[in-house]
Amino acid sequence: MTNGTKVLKRDGQTEGLNLEKIHKMTEEACEGLAGVSASQVEIQSGIQFYDGVTTAEIQEILVRSASDLIDLDAPNYQFVAARLLLFGLYKQVFGDWKKGFPSVRDHLVSGSEKKIYDPTLESKYSDDEWSKINSWVDHNRDLTFTYAGLRQVVDKYLVQDRSTSEVYESPQFMYMLISAAIFAEYPQETRLDYIKRYYDAISKHKINIPTPIMA
């Protein structure tokens, strides 16, 4: 279902504001969380849409609307806002991410071609090692972020073009590529164990990474 508001898509085309798509997204962001309502997020955001609004702006309006609902009586809106921010991030980085994520190796190669990653890292590990490294990436861990935590990671630490605000990676790929880079020169017999343990620790937020490493 659409209304009369025109939306400017990423490819430059326009379409009617799809209210059903927005509802589906907000429902997914609220799934499994107590004390939150997709309808409340939609009501909070609805008056902010205007003709010519971009899809990225719609996403940010939804994020802001959810974050405005965070209070002591409804703390779980911090996770709703984080998920809405995450959905927009995935769309920007991966496109149609619902079809699945690329492997961490493919992501590294693609990023190296864009000159955002060190191209020598890919050759430091064998095919079998990359297969194991990829099997440990758990994108569901992104869902554990609070809004404040994810906003900080997106704004400060993910690889991006600061002039356009285009982001090139997700939190889990950042964590795994940091781990792979740190232990690349360690002995082959032990480095995969170190990578997995370090990735698990930072992606589960058991330890914090020093800012110079993340940046």
Predicted regions and their residues:
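Extended catalytic cores of very large enzyme megasubunits
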Residues: 1-215
